[in-house]
């Protein structure tokens, strides 16, 4: 990513920290071909440019595997199964399904390409599925009101 983007992120994370908040970023945990033999994972790029700043990473990686697809397991896979060991949240299914990444788990999605909650027979609610390391992975304001 451009240096200006990283400078903005550092300033934003620092500004939040000064007011008692911890930043969280929603970003790709998927390998991307940047061309000319260069590949990146956005989460790794952000993390390496933020240094030791305390940031919560909410990554998406709906590619099957590692994503299980549109399934609601009793014990969902941990965020580290996304391929990003420091992820606090992993979005492993999206609606509508991204066909280029989910061909191996297409059968887990509805025929219309969306993911629905079990029991949603009316298909009223598009569903994205996530797992997290805790019930409150961003820790809110650290307990402050």
Go through each PLM region and give its residues.
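Second-shell loop/turn segments in exported
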Residues: 1-4, 13
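Aromatic-lined carbohydrate-recognition surfaces of secreted/lumenal glycan-active proteins
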Residues: 16-36
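Short, solvent-exposed polar/charged micro-motifs at secondary-structure junctions
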Residues: 1, 35-37, 99-101
